């Protein structure tokens, strides 16, 4: 059972304000107190916050293939063990394990593995929670494949999706697809009926088709700017529609590579902090040295902050969530409340779990992260358990 904790003298980023020199109490894995005054009840452990640190809701990464040597498509318990245990280092307290376009049997194995791991292993770990699965492909456009292997791309297939969702035990929460590959929007309509997010991505659709897809139930955009038709003033394409259409919540990889800092700022200005979600889209090389790694059956060369296929195509990222938050502070001068929105609250709302995650609120899961003024992670708490403490946090 998680111990009772008291975090004291810290700036607390709540839904509506930043409480200075506040207190957050944790009992039985839940937030029990958020106050400007010290609670009267005793706690088994007290955490004195470092000077100028900030308490945020735990970050939720809804689009992550892997990191630290692991990849969702490895379809092994050790893969999810690694992701769950290492993601708190970057402030992530929950995530969607993300697949890639592959041979159908390989996708099935990854889905079954996630279901079985969550049932058998997760409760014994003190790390990030697996909220479900983001199925990226294979129902995408070969014209905008990006790093999705073209040989396994196929048109949308509702029956195949139903099979996969059964194998996943209902864990598929987001499906990235191209609407032009979904005849009569059959899959989009099915996803809406099942309360699964239909995300437009790896698509060459025009604005009219996307607007029709939104009417059918599409509500999300996968990694804005990447693997999609570009903006033109006479045909806004996917980018223009994502920015201007109020019906779409939009993902963004804020690494300064997948999108220029000004493009990231434009996304923030257009969508505001209520309809933008930071993601990493990271692959297994995150946290490792430069070198050649496998991603979706392809060789990816990692140098510095970039991961590229042999033809120069970007192949996922090696971004960490706290780095994305820092970049957005730099690119947009946004507030800490904005950061809480785009790293946690919006994802929780989109997934329909805002009743238990996504904000520093009494009664919710104690998923919390303490960061420095430049978004370095100092301490991460997952469901009331201390999952990560930085080496520099000697005073805690």
Curated annotation (Swiss-Prot):
Which residues are named in the active-site annotation?
281 (proton donor)
Q: Which reactions does this protein catalyse? A: N-acetyl-D-glucosamine 6-phosphate + H2O = D-glucosamine 6-phosphate + acetate
Q: Which positions in this protein are listed as binding Fe cation 1?
A: 63, 65, 136, 281
Q: Which residues bind Fe cation 2?
A: 136, 202, 223
Q: Does the keyword Hydrolase apply?
A: yes
Q: What is its EC number?
A: 3.5.1.25
The top EC class, named as a word, is: hydrolase
Which InterPro entries does the record cross-reference, listed alphabetically?
Amidohydro-rel, GlcNAc_6-P_deAcase, Metal-dep_hydrolase_composite, Metal_Hydrolase
Q: How is the cofactor bound?
A: Binds 2 divalent metal cations per subunit.
In Gene Ontology terms, what is a biological process of this protein? N-acetylglucosamine catabolic process
- GO MF entries: iron ion binding; N-acetylglucosamine-6-phosphate deacetylase activity; protein homodimerization activity
**Gene induction:** Expression is repressed by the HTH-type transcriptional regulator NagR.
Involved pathway(s): Amino-sugar metabolism; N-acetylneuraminate degradation; D-fructose 6-phosphate from N-acetylneuraminate: step 4/5
Pfam families xrefs:
Amidohydro_1, BsNagA_N
In this chain, substrate is annotated as bound at 147-148, 226-227, 234, 255-258, 314-316
State if Hydrolase is listed as a keyword. yes
Q: Which Gene3D superfamilies match?
A: Metal-dependent hydrolases (3.20.20.140), Urease, subunit C, domain 1 (2.30.40.10)
Assigned keywords, A-Z: Carbohydrate metabolism, Hydrolase, Iron, Metal-binding
Q: What happens when the gene is disrupted?
A: Deletion of the gene prevents growth on N-acetylglucosamine, but has no effect on growth on glucosamine.
Taxonomy, superkingdom: Bacteria
- What cofactors are annotated for this protein? a divalent metal cation
Function summary = Involved in the first committed step in the biosynthesis of amino-sugar-nucleotides. Catalyzes the hydrolysis of the N-acetyl group of N-acetylglucosamine-6-phosphate (GlcNAc-6-P) to yield glucosamine 6-phosphate and acetate. Essential for growth on N-acetylglucosamine.
The UniProt family comment states: Belongs to the metallo-dependent hydrolases superfamily. NagA family.
Quaternary structure annotation from Swiss-Prot or TrEMBL: Homodimer.
The name this protein carries in UniProt is N-acetylglucosamine-6-phosphate deacetylase
Q: Which organism is it from?
A: Bacillus subtilis (strain 168)
């Amino acid at each position: 059972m998680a111990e009772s904790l008291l975090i004291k003298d810290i700036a607390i980023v709540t839904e509506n304000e930043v409480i200075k020199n506040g207190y957050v109490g944790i009992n039985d894995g839940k937030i029990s107190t958020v106050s400007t005054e010290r609670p009267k009840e005793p706690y088994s452990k007290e955490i004195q916050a470092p000077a100028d640190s900030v308490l945020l809701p735990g970050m939720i990464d809804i689009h992550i293939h892997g990191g630290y040597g692991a990849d969702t498509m490895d379809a092994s318990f050790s893969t999810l063990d690694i992701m769950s245990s290492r993601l708190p280092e970057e402030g992530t307290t929950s995530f969607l394990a993300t697949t890639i376009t592959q041979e159908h049997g390989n996708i099935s194995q990854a889905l079954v593995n996630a279901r079985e791991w969550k049932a058998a292993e997760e409760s014994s770990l003190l790390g990030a929670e697996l909220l479900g699965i983001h199925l990226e492909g294979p129902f995408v456009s070969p014209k905008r494949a990006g790093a999705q292997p073209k040989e396994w791309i196929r048109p949308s297939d509702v029956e195949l999706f139903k099979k996969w969702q059964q194998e996943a035990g209902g864990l598929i929460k987001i499906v990235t697809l191209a609407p032009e590959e979904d005849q009569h929007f059959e899959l989009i309509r099915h996803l809406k009926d099942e309360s699964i997010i239909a995300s437009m991505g790896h698509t060459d659709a025009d604005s009219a088709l996307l607007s029709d897809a939104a009417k059918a139930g599409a509500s999300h955009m996968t990694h804005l700017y990447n693997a999609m038709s570009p903006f033109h003033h006479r045909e806004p394409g996917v980018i223009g529609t994502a920015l201007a259409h109020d019906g779409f919540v939009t993902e963004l990889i804020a690494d300064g590579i997948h999108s220029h800092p000004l493009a990231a700022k434009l996304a923030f200005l257009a969508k505001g902090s209520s309809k933008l979600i930071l993601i990493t889209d990271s692959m297994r090389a995150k946290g490792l040295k430069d070198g050649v790694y496998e991603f979706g059956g392809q060789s990816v060369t990692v140098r510095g902050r970039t991961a590229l296929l042999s033809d120069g195509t970007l192949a996922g990222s090696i971004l960490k969530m706290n780095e994305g938050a820092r970049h957005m502070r730099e690119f947009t001068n946004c507030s800490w409340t904005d950061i809480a929105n785009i790293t946690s609250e919006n994802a929780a709302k989109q997934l329909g779990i805002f009743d238990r995650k996504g904000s520093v609120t009494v009664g919710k899961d104690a998923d919390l992260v303490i960061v420095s003024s430049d978004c370095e992670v100092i301490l991460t708490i997952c469901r009331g358990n201390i999952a990560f403490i930085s080496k520099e946090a000697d005073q805690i």
